């Protein structure tokens, strides 16, 4: 090959290395190593000092058996001369004043040093250099000329990369500003929806159907039973019903019915007279009296003891009661709303809940959708919770689009309450104003909910619909090994998956129970039982 053709091929090789679609650091390292093969370098490198808005750039050869260029520092005197003259040729560094302070530790024999300045952004700010063994027939002038051409190509490549990088940063900043603007508009809309629907945020079909139904229910005084998983917003819906009813200016009283004794529940709900029991030093008005003319929400109604259920049934039917320790019958006008996440049908079958009370309170049920069925609501809720956090703590945090995408893919078995906790925890620990997907606890395996769902899938492989009492228990486990269905337990997560699978099969079958039974490989009777157990009202759906 002619010498001119050989040089053309070499220039093509280094141009190809510089134009490769890789990161700048990788591109320049490949360029320097390609150059080292052409120029028979012992070692060489490229150095571009840091400038305003740009970081320092270095690249070094990786020749096996040769001294490392990455650990070598070119003398300042040599650098200054390159910057002044644009090039430098030192046939033997051992005899050069420029390198006198570095000869002792180098110990690599007679060595030539050749360098050329690199112009970046119309300023000479860096250099391309290499060393090679001193040879009598070496044409230094030709090599430094070739090195200057290579340095010119490298400078252009660096300028191109920096220009693209600056444009990408500008574009990303503009995109972020636009996203922040959309977030602000969304938060404003969310606040308007919040005011309109009394704290209920969202616009999914499932949620809006429940909201519209609740507003229709508000027009009458009928007893309402709110059903849904924990954290689905039963109290918010109770307030919505109250605020859209004719009782909106009257009291709204809420009472959580935990596993209290009959006497304590009776005292809390009906009140007591002075001296009715030890510690009753004064007359006390109960929740029913406090709610007279308004609305009373009794949450966790499935937890009240059987002995108290008969007394509650009397109040529901007749609207009258006596205070504990009293003889006077009191009558009240109260709109009753009950709420539960418990399987009341199973409780009735097990004798834990009175059948007559069940029919009395379940006449007008409203099933609240879990968060995983509310398509598109998670970003709206997350932004609203973050806005509330910002207002409470004087912060100015916002979500990156990737963060909202990540949240939208989460199951959240604890529903809205769990989502709010997730947002608050992440915001509290946020190290910058922009929350990204990597900031969430589940990314470091610190999310209990994530581990809970993984555990359910890994432990059981698949979930079957519960069969009626007396048949094989859920998942084939002994009846006494089935975990308690308490909020946050694996039993709850299992229950949620069962319900999802049941509804999916029914949707696929067009809500035909016989077809759904074939899909699930169950009998129609088992599917009917599962519908009752999970509170799925086929007629409503």
Curated annotation (Swiss-Prot):
Residues 499-541 are annotated as: C-terminal DNA-binding domain. Residues 23-158 form the GAF domain. It holds the Pfam family Sigma54_activat. Residues 200-428 form the Sigma-54 factor interaction domain. ATP binds at residues 228-235, 291-300. Residues 513-532 bind DNA. GO terms for biological process: nitrogen fixation; phosphorelay signal transduction system. It comes from the Bacteria. Residues 170-191 are annotated as: Disordered. One of its GO terms (molecular function) is sequence-specific DNA binding. Keywords: Activator, ATP-binding, DNA-binding, Metal-binding, Nitrogen fixation, Nucleotide-binding, Plasmid, Transcription, Transcription regulation, Two-component regulatory system. Residues 429-498 are annotated as: Inter-domain linker. Coiled coil: none annotated. A divalent metal cation binds at residues 442, 447. Interacts with sigma-54. Required for activation of most nif operons, which are directly involved in nitrogen fixation. NCBIfam families: nifA. This is Nif-specific regulatory protein. It comes from Rhizobium meliloti (strain 1021) (Ensifer meliloti). The lineage of its organism: Bacteria, Pseudomonadati, Pseudomonadota, Alphaproteobacteria, Hyphomicrobiales. The gene is nifA.
